[in-house]
Amino acid sequence: MKKLFLSAMLGLSLISCSALQNQKTMTTDWKHTTNIYEVNVRQFSKEGTFKAVEKELPRLKRMGVETLWFMPITPIAQKNKKGTLGSQYAAQDYTSINPEFGTLEDFKSVVNEAHKMGFKVI
């Protein structure tokens, strides 16, 4: 009886050890640990342009920013707009860049430079 009990305990121990080896180790993905800096281009600088944001990337890096979230960058709808500037969240065209901020090439430039510096960009 004692041998049977010890054999059963040994068997259970081996089964539990092999079960632990089969479990996947949970990895923490960057999206769960990163900090995010929302870049509202219009209010980011006096110029309110992509080029002005690009000049400030080193400062954002020194601040410890890891991810840049550009919000919003589309042209602003003019129909029923609020105030003189309108709401940036009222997009006129989701496939275009707001010309007040610069060109598509200007936006690509700031994104490319941000990537070179190790930022993630949303």
Regions found by a protein language model. Name each.
Residues M1-L4:
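Positively charged n-region of N-terminal signal peptides that target proteins for export
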